[in-house]
Amino acid sequence: QWWHIQVSPMEIQTPEPALNHYINRWALYQTIACRLFARAGLYQCGGGYGFRDQLQDVGALISTSPVLAREQILRCCAHQFEEGDVQHWWHPEGTDRPERGVRTRITDDLLWLPYTVSCWTEVWGLDGLLEEPVSYLRSPVLAKDELERYERPERSERFESVYQHCTRAMECVLARGVGEHGLCRMGTGDWNDGMNHIGAQGWGESVWLTWFFGLVLERWGAVAGRCGDREAAER
């Protein structure tokens, strides 16, 4: 019955039976069972949470499984560092201590948080999620010669709202600045992990990342306006 509730809200009818069969129940089932619960696939069987990965996944669940989507948004907020960057991935350990994970210079990860939260507000409005307090992670920032670090960070005593977590993520991307062509610096990734060394020295730029950041800023401006944050909305 639980599975029926999760996968039954969406149904399509097209002239293609195979497409109907997949979209009606199986697509949502696969998203929840494989991507969110098992976190495994033919190409990646590590079982870790990916910051960007599972935020993208729950984007498909906001309307149909809001409890699961909300839990993942809060989980990702809790894996953001005080400086605004995030753990690219981490392994759940079932303890009260922060999990081991990798801190990187990948830039697009950060932006999936405000993007997904903006999608949430389109469906559920200002329902209280943005005001939820969540703590940060704390560890030494990456040194100039560090591209990434696998570590167990500390849990920060600082709690801020989901709204502030999203703001910190965008401010972090803004602080990384643009390159000589006026495009966002990609750091060690812009969604395409195979390009992780292109921006490693600090000068690599990304057209895709610039497009995505522009989209996120546009959407977040609308969220800020609805929240009464006029300064952020106008910025």
Briefly describe each language-model feature range.
Residues 37, 68-69, 87, 131, ...:
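Secondary-structure transition/capping residues
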Residues 1-47, 142-156, 163, 221-234:
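Acidic/polar, glycine-enriched structural segments that form the non-catalytic walls/loops
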Residues 61-69, 73-180, 206-214:
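Aromatic-rich carbohydrate-recognition surfaces in CAZymes
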